[in-house]
Amino acid sequence: MIWYPYEQMKTMKAPYKIIKAKGVHLYTEDQKLIDSVSSWWCMIHGYQHPELTAAIQEQAANFCHVMLGGLTHDPVEKLSAKLEGFLPGDLNYCFFSDSGSVAVEVALKMALQYNTNQCDDHPEMKKRTLILALEHAYHGDTFKAMEVGDDEDYHFAFDKKEGVVHIPTEIPALEEAFALYHDKLNCFIVEPLLQGAGGMRMYDISFLKRARELCDEYGVLLIFDEVATGFGRTGNRFVADLVLPDILVLGKALTGGYIGHAVTVANEKVFRGFYSDNERHALMHGPTFM
């Protein structure tokens, strides 16, 4: 039996049974429906796009999946180079995973361990573990992603830990949070400009610009979760083109929705925080599918 997402299985209505999908349409036995939610915002080129279908068929004839543990291959190298070519600034270091939620987990692990590695090398530095996030945020359903999210409808059954502070998208609240917590703050994670599952809430670019200034002033890492907003959803290709984060998370439209895939992209500063002769400073994360 299938256990469906976000449903009370006892009372849920029978789902539409899809037998075919093409373009913007989903087909049942007797209906042609417009997929206005784009399979949770990932099918940006529509279903059965001939170029994407052909690419998958061509790759499958060679191999579908090879792990990156001790191995590499042309497709992942080409994808990484392509991302490096059109992402802004020095966002050049791509860590691949299988979903947006996992990519958020990787981003938070990067940020927290970045500080740990620095403290190893510089004992006079203070450990920083507090994470700043936004009210009404949604970053996924895995555990750390739930912690930085702020939606009781999704995550009411799980206790919040004390390591996250949520603020509204208002500059005075942002400045107050940095004034209060700057010596404890590790990172600030946001869905830039548009909060998706939290209610399609938009806010002004001035908030992000001020966040960048404060992060620079106090040595806090800025993380943009563009799983939903990336690839043109806000007008620009990425909000990161307007305000540059230290870590960028992409998913959903990354593959046009044809396979589950995501990437966490770090800048030079973050990557250098792991590049060391000390084996303990390696990023110890490795999804099967990446």
PLM regions and their residue ranges:
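Conserved N-terminal phosphate-binding loop of PLP-dependent enzymes in the Aspartate aminotransferase
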Residues: 1-290
